[in-house]
Swiss-Prot record:
N6-(pyridoxal phosphate)lysine modification, residue list: K229
Annotated source species: Thiobacillus denitrificans (strain ATCC 25259 / T1)
Entry GO CC: cytosol
Name of protein: Serine hydroxymethyltransferase
Alphabetical keyword list: Amino-acid biosynthesis, Cytoplasm, One-carbon metabolism, Pyridoxal phosphate, Transferase
Amino acid sequence: MFNRQDTLAKTDPDLWAAIQQEDRRQQDHIELIASENYTSPAVMQAQGSQLTNKYAEGYPGKRYYGGCEYVDIVEQLAIDRVKALFGAEAANVQPNSGSQANQAVFMAFLKPGDTIMGMSLAEGGHLTHGMALNMSGKWFNVVAYGLNEKEEIDYEAMERLAREHKPKLIIAGASAYALRIDFERFAKIAKEIGAIFMVDMAHYAGLIAAGLYPNPVPHADVVTSTTHKTLRGPRGGIILMKAEHEKAINSAIFPGLQGGPLMHVIAGKATAFKEAATKDFKRYQEQVIDNALVMCKVLVERGLRIISGRTESHVFLVDLRAKNLTGKEAEALLGRAHITVNKNAIPNDPQKPFVTSGIRIGTPAMTTRGFTELEAEQLAHLIADVLDAPNDEAVVERVKGEVAKLTAKFPVYG
C-alpha cells in the first residue's frame, strides 16, 4: 500500500526541485502573459484529490464504469454552476482544453471540405479558427476576416465574405484582440445565411462571467472556452450550447474525441465556477480592466503605440517598431528584468511569426496578486524604461530590483 508520508519531495527530489524552482519563478516574476493566471488553493486542492484515480467514461447517470456515484455529483455540480454563470441552456465540462472544445464543435457540425469562417491569425485570431497548419485549416475550406484601417474587426467585410462564401460555420473570438466583439452582429449574418454561429470566448470568459464584457451565449449556437485565463480555473475547456445541440456536442466529446474525462480537473472547474459567481470575482475583473487601461495610457505617453488605439478588456498589443525592437528582443529583455510577456504579431506584421513586431500584455495574473492602478502605472513605466534602453544592463538590473520589491509586497499566495 501507499504511505502518505512518501511525499513527492521524498520520492522524487529531482522533480520536486523543478517544481519548487517554478514556484519561485512565479513568485519572483511579474506575469503579464494574457493567457496565464493563478488558481486558488481550493482549485489546486480539487485537482490534487483522489478524483484523479477514477475513470468515468460517459456522462452523469450514464457511465460505462461502476463506482461513479460520487464523481457524478462532481460533474453535475460543474455543469449546473457553469450554466448558471453564463446563462446557458446546456453545458459540457469534459473537454481537456479549449482546442479540443473547438474540435468537438467541428466534429458535431462539419464534414471535411466544408467552409468555415474565422478571424485571421495574423490579425488577432486563434490557430484553431482556420490556421493553415492546424487541423481546422487542413480539414476545412477557410475564409478569414480581419481588421479595418482602425484596427477594429471589419464587420462589413465579414458580412460581405459570409454572403459570398456562405460558410457552414462562423467563428467569433480571438487570442489577441483588445476590443469588445459585437456578437449580435455576427449572429444576424449567421442566421441570414443559415450558418452555425460559434463563439470562442476563451480570453474573455472571466470578464463575461462578471458582466463586464458582452455575453455571447444568448446569440450563439455554441460557445467554447478555456477554464483558465481570466476565468482563473484549472487548465481545461468547456462547451456551452443551445439545448438542441447538446446531444451532438456530447457525442463529439465522448466517444468522438475523448475517453474517460479528467474528474480531478472537472472538480477544479466546479470550484472555479463557484468562485466566479461571487462579488469578489466581479471586483477582481473590474480591477483587471482598470489596470489594463492605466498601463495603456502610460505606455502611450512613453512613446509606444497600442494596437486598435485602446483596450476594452484585459489584454492589449504593443507595437514596438518605434523603439526599433522586435517582439522576440523585447520578450527577452523584459524577461531579464523578471517581467514576463510574450512576443506577438501585430496586424500586417513585416516580421516572421517567431520574431514579430509586438508584444502582448495581459493584466489578469498581476491583478490576482493584488496590483491596482498604482502598481499598474509603476509597472508600465518600468516596462518602458527597459524598452527605452535595450543595451543598458544597469537599467535592467534597476528594474529587476523594483520588480523584486513589488513581488515581495504582493505575493501570489499569502
